[in-house]
Amino acid sequence: MDSQPTHFQLRSVVHDTLKSHQGQISDLTAQHEGSLKQLFLMFKPRNNMLDKEYDHQAIQGGDESLEGFDEWREQYKLGEGSSVNTISIPNLPAISPPATTVDYPDEPSVDLPTVASSSTSAARPNPIRDPSSSIIDSPLTNVPLDTSITSLVDGVEEEPTVNMSQIQPRPFVPRDYTPPPELDVPEWVPLDNYRPAATPTTPPQLLMPLTSAYATELPPLPLLNSTSSSASFRRRKRTNSPQPDMFKLQATFSLNPLSSALTRSSKCVLTCDWKVAMDEMRHVRAMERIEAKKAENRWSLRQPKKARGPGVPKSHWDYMLEEMEWMRTDFAEERRWKVVEAREFAYQVVEWHLASPEEKKALMVGGRGWGECRNVPIPGHAGKRKEVTVEVEAEDEDVEMLVGQEGELDGEGEANKVLESIDEMRVNEKERENRPEDPRETVNINQDIGEEVDAEGEADADGEPENGEADAEGEADADGGPVGDDVVGLSEIDAAQDDTRETSERPSYRRDTVLPNGLVIHKRFANAYEIAIARGPVLDTPLANATVDLDTLTKSSSAATPATVPAEPSVSPDEPASFDQLFPDLAMYSGPAPPENDKKYRRDEGGTYSHRMAHTSRIMDIRPILVSTLQPAKNLIDGEWDLHDGPYYEEVKGAADIPPNVVAAFNTPFGGKASRPLEHMRVPEVPKPAAHHLRAQLLWSPEEDKCLLKLVAMYPFNWDLIADSFNTEMILIPVEKRNPYECWERWYYTFGEGKNKPRQDAPPSAPPPAPASATQPGTATATPVPQSAVTTPGVPPSANLPSASGRPQQTGGNSVSSLPTPTGEALPDGAPPPPGMSKRDRMAAKPKYEGTKRSVRHQAIYDAVKRMNRRREAARAKSHKDNAQRKVINVHESHSMSFPHVAASTPWELVEAKYQRDVQIAQQRQQRAMQEQQRQLAIRQQQAMMSAQQQAQMRPPNMPNVPNMPNAQPIRMGPNGQPMPTMAPSQQQLLNAVAAATAANRQNANGAVQGNPNVRPMPVVQGQSPQVQQQMLLQAQQMAAQQARVLQAQAQAQAQQGRAPSMGGNLQPPQLGVSSPFAQSRTPDLPAEGAGPSGINPTPSPAMQAAAIGAQSSPQIATMGRAPSNNVPPHLRVPNAGTSSPQISSPMALPQGIPNGAGMPVQGAQTQGIQIPAAMMNNATVQQLLATLAASGQQMTPEQLRGLMLRSAHMQAQAQSQVGNPGTPQMGVQNIQGVQHFARSPSLQNAQSQPRSSPKPGPANGQGT
């Protein structure tokens, strides 16, 4: 049930609603007032638009423009009777002037419709009305507008224009305001003030796709340097830069280290940033070490000069380094000299080609001109040929002379042939320049310049047969027929003369011309100028034409200037020139030609199919670089580029991403550079190991296939590296590692060319073997299948296994290939053994393991373990047999003693034995200490008994028998003659007692005289801390209580002996037994066990009573006030049965001079047989407990007080129950029943439990170790 809203909640809601409405009303009021102010400013200037002072007032603005606004605002104020709705705002006409048909030089002409004049304003949709008819109630007086826009200025009529104030009254008026519709806007007439710029004389630059105006303004890049980028970067550094101040840097880094900012950085911190911080910290640490050394006077600003060490003799390596240094210098100088020589030779060659013939003659050796070397005899040369004048009369002699001369000329060397070819080229050039008309003049010119021409009637100078020339005597005929013995006659000489004349009359033709730059001009062109004219039409062809017709070039080439020397007749002038003739400077593309020799795969270096083609784009000449990569704002400084790295210095040579098949076609990882198809790249089969029959076929998961493809792409067809990388990355089990053959087989038959090909080792008709494991879709884990599903019924298991000799089959099962047959060949495709085989061969051919990969591995491991066990047993039996047969030679009869074989003890047994031995040693030491203490205690008891007897004789009869002790406090007696409880001794008295006890122990340790009661207490040091004083106080209380118990027990025994005859009856004499304040004989909650009829415990022997007193003491007081045994380490002490604390050792010797029974009257009265009421006893006990707690500095709480009382009562009950079976002093009071022993060994829990017996043979309880 929903609760009703309270009155306070309703009031709060109404208040919030009214407040929000009031805020909205105030916002609307402010907006309304602003809107009214804008409307007032828009309506106000409409009557002053033609006023000349309007512009000046509008510029000044201010509060004067709002004059009359308050009266006008009252009419349109929000509320009842407001006339806001009566305001009407006319529409705004077009602000921009109407379009015209003026043609500008830089704009295309557009035919636009003409705008109607002002006479047709009646047809407009928004007619302009007269201002007097406006419904807008303006606060100002309406002034009629002057529609005449013309005015006379200095007698000059202005051009018809429109004042902007008529269209837009004020510049700051919003755009949504329109002038009154009564305003008649005349037609806009543009002024003739457009003066366009003159047409530029130079055409504008057409930017190419790879250029921009910004890039063209940048300066050119510097030339590439041959040095590395690092050298240029080092050169960029300034050598004269001042060294930084190290101490200033240290102060800066120490005050504001960069490392502190990096650790709290909110942005990404790169490695370079951390390196900067590390360098900074390294510098700071170095400077700190320097400052530390300076403080220790171990740093000097002037470092001492390093001492010169002894000379080291040179070794062979030192001499070799010296020689290498000298050779390096020699080679560097030789290289520089060769560079200088080559430069000088290049300058001389250029100078030679640019020199005139006279200058060339001066430049040549000896000052002779070019071609004059034939006039200089060469030593050892036969000399130049001589012209022989032949007379007609001596024909026979001439014939003999010609024959002999011909034989001499045949012996000339190749030098003459070279000179002849050079002379012939020189003659041809001069003939082209002179252009002789008569061929006979050519012969004369040749004779003038020195060319050898055969004389009339002589044979050819070269001795070579020309047209129709007969062979020499003794040589074979030209037609192959033998020559007779006839001698050459004049007919042959005349024929030779006629042939020579025909040769001289024959015209010379042009040959190919070689230019100085190495280009060869075709013989159809005389010079390079003709080539430029011939290929002009090709270069002038528009870019839109994709082809060029060479037939159109015939006329242009024939129109060239006729050459001096005609071309060969084989070159027809009507035949068009080819592209290789027109462009000899460009390499023509030719496809790869078949090899001509046996080297099939040798690359054709002379072919042009692998070279750069013709110059078709400027990208082939330049390297386009984006301007953004150069970063001109960063690297362009004062018009110079500062580039030392980046894409500008990128190496041109780089390795491209070549497909693996292309790489494999040119190079193979297994040797050889000849390309081989992928079929020939099969990896040779890896040698099978000895236990190959134990290897199961491995399955390939999708992840492994992906890794294999990645490695094949990374290391193309390097199967050794692929297998190694695959096993490192994917395989974790050694038995599942893949070898290179398996990797190649998986790739070839799954992803390579053999994907759709049948395997060579698989029979074509054999069905695929049944899978031995089923792989779940999406997983790579094989699910084992029962063996019955693997094997085929009626067929041995080996029939379902792949062949052992071929490559491993990719089957679903994990079965092991069978063993080879006795002939050395495995059964093909796991077929059953033939029937003729023996049983042994059948068993050998049968597969050893079957099943999944895991089961096969487990079986193999199990068999290996069994074989190892058998070998171990065999080796052990053999060793026993050898030991039995071995004869033992006894050197002495003591060596023949047989010792029982004892197994080695475990560490726990050794520790236990050591502990038992230490316990025995400690007990023996403690017994000796106790005996010494008992001897000293007997001496003190005798002295106490003597002093007690003396005091008893001097005491009145009505006083209780209390031993008279020195410094004893008087006992206050009650009204019935019983002693009253007294308060505990003061702190100073207890401190004095502790000092006296310490002095007594020191005297006993030093061998002083025992029994001296006059022990001078040591003064208490006033500067001791409160904790030390409290500890000494507790020790004094403990020692005083123990000494009082012993003395009172002695006095009680003596009193019983002296009063026994006189007392009579069953009443026992009063006993002055003193006990610990925490050990009460009986409490209301815990009654004492073994008490007599009167409720008083029987009196034990003095030694046993001392033990009982030790058991009744509090654990806290006994722990802090115990006296350590004589020279017994704490870890070797064994507690006795007389105490419940594990740290209290045997009773110690009590010092003399301690008051007996001081502060213990209640316990003494109870020991004497005086019955103390429970209330009085509890009061005394509580007082003692409070005093003890206050002395120890603990907080006194009821819970803690009650716990201490219960513990004291329980301990007292245990001590009383043990009185019936006391132990002798010689036994060390360890046989008291019911008291637990807290020892180091967990095997001993109490005195009744026996020590644990050792499992090994030997003395019981570890006593014999």
Swiss-Prot record:
<dbReference type="InterPro" id="IPR001005">
    <property type="entry name" value="SANT/Myb"/>
</dbReference>
<feature type="compositionally biased region" description="Low complexity">
    <location>
        <begin position="124"/>
        <end position="139"/>
    </location>
</feature>
<keyword id="KW-0234">DNA repair</keyword>
<feature type="domain" description="Myb-like">
    <location>
        <begin position="700"/>
        <end position="751"/>
    </location>
</feature>
<dbReference type="GO" id="GO:0006281">
    <property type="term" value="P:DNA repair"/>
</dbReference>
<dbReference type="GO" id="GO:0035267">
    <property type="term" value="C:NuA4 histone acetyltransferase complex"/>
</dbReference>
<keyword id="KW-0539">Nucleus</keyword>
<keyword id="KW-0010">Activator</keyword>
<feature type="compositionally biased region" description="Acidic residues">
    <location>
        <begin position="449"/>
        <end position="478"/>
    </location>
</feature>
<feature type="compositionally biased region" description="Polar residues">
    <location>
        <begin position="1073"/>
        <end position="1083"/>
    </location>
</feature>
<feature type="region of interest" description="Disordered">
    <location>
        <begin position="555"/>
        <end position="575"/>
    </location>
</feature>
<dbReference type="InterPro" id="IPR017930">
    <property type="entry name" value="Myb_dom"/>
</dbReference>
<feature type="compositionally biased region" description="Basic and acidic residues">
    <location>
        <begin position="498"/>
        <end position="510"/>
    </location>
</feature>
<feature type="region of interest" description="Disordered">
    <location>
        <begin position="114"/>
        <end position="140"/>
    </location>
</feature>
<feature type="compositionally biased region" description="Polar residues">
    <location>
        <begin position="800"/>
        <end position="821"/>
    </location>
</feature>
<feature type="compositionally biased region" description="Polar residues">
    <location>
        <begin position="1212"/>
        <end position="1234"/>
    </location>
</feature>
<comment type="similarity">
    <text>Belongs to the EAF1 family.</text>
</comment>
<feature type="coiled-coil region">
    <location>
        <begin position="871"/>
        <end position="944"/>
    </location>
</feature>
<dbReference type="InterPro" id="IPR014012">
    <property type="entry name" value="HSA_dom"/>
</dbReference>
<feature type="compositionally biased region" description="Low complexity">
    <location>
        <begin position="555"/>
        <end position="570"/>
    </location>
</feature>
<dbReference type="GO" id="GO:0005634">
    <property type="term" value="C:nucleus"/>
</dbReference>
<feature type="region of interest" description="Disordered">
    <location>
        <begin position="755"/>
        <end position="855"/>
    </location>
</feature>
<feature type="compositionally biased region" description="Low complexity">
    <location>
        <begin position="1053"/>
        <end position="1062"/>
    </location>
</feature>
<feature type="domain" description="HSA">
    <location>
        <begin position="304"/>
        <end position="380"/>
    </location>
</feature>
<dbReference type="GO" id="GO:0006325">
    <property type="term" value="P:chromatin organization"/>
</dbReference>
<comment type="function">
    <text>Component of the NuA4 histone acetyltransferase complex which is involved in transcriptional activation of selected genes principally by acetylation of nucleosomal histone H4 and H2A. The NuA4 complex is also involved in DNA repair.</text>
</comment>
<keyword id="KW-0804">Transcription</keyword>
<keyword id="KW-0227">DNA damage</keyword>
<feature type="region of interest" description="Disordered">
    <location>
        <begin position="404"/>
        <end position="510"/>
    </location>
</feature>
<keyword id="KW-0156">Chromatin regulator</keyword>
<feature type="compositionally biased region" description="Basic and acidic residues">
    <location>
        <begin position="423"/>
        <end position="441"/>
    </location>
</feature>
<feature type="region of interest" description="Disordered">
    <location>
        <begin position="1053"/>
        <end position="1093"/>
    </location>
</feature>
<dbReference type="Pfam" id="PF07529">
    <property type="entry name" value="HSA"/>
</dbReference>
<feature type="region of interest" description="Disordered">
    <location>
        <begin position="225"/>
        <end position="244"/>
    </location>
</feature>
<keyword id="KW-0805">Transcription regulation</keyword>
<feature type="region of interest" description="Disordered">
    <location>
        <begin position="1212"/>
        <end position="1265"/>
    </location>
</feature>
<keyword id="KW-0175">Coiled coil</keyword>
<feature type="compositionally biased region" description="Basic and acidic residues">
    <location>
        <begin position="838"/>
        <end position="853"/>
    </location>
</feature>
<feature type="compositionally biased region" description="Polar residues">
    <location>
        <begin position="1242"/>
        <end position="1253"/>
    </location>
</feature>
<protein>
    <recommendedName>
        <fullName>Chromatin modification-related protein EAF1</fullName>
    </recommendedName>
</protein>
<comment type="subunit">
    <text>Component of the NuA4 histone acetyltransferase complex.</text>
</comment>
<dbReference type="Pfam" id="PF13921">
    <property type="entry name" value="Myb_DNA-bind_6"/>
</dbReference>
